[in-house]
């Protein structure tokens, strides 16, 4: 049986909660702001470290993909947004991003066989900006 890493997930929660933390509760991480870019840069660093291929579309949605055993199989996509409203919840959106990251990290770390390419995704501007 395979298990996600509590240590890896705790590290992600600790690290990503810094991006947009003004020190008074909640997170302010507007889409495409400096704080959003810091979170995205960290995501790219971690996904690149496991060998994922990184792509960005014309709307700045980002994709990290690890190949499956069948190059013709449709990819499985999971993820969320990392932007927030002003003083938004610490885990709103970003928890889905971190969970998708953990799936890919676990598949790679545990060498789990899989047919379909697996993609972690960050959606851009889900919350809208001020």
Name each model-derived stretch.
Residues 50, 62-92, 100:
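Catalytic-core environment of secreted peptidases
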Residues 11-21, 39, 54, 71-76:
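N-terminal glycine-rich anion-binding loops that anchor highly charged ligand groups
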Residues 13, 17-20, 50-51, 104-111:
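Structural signal for hydrophobic packing residues in well-ordered secondary-structure cores
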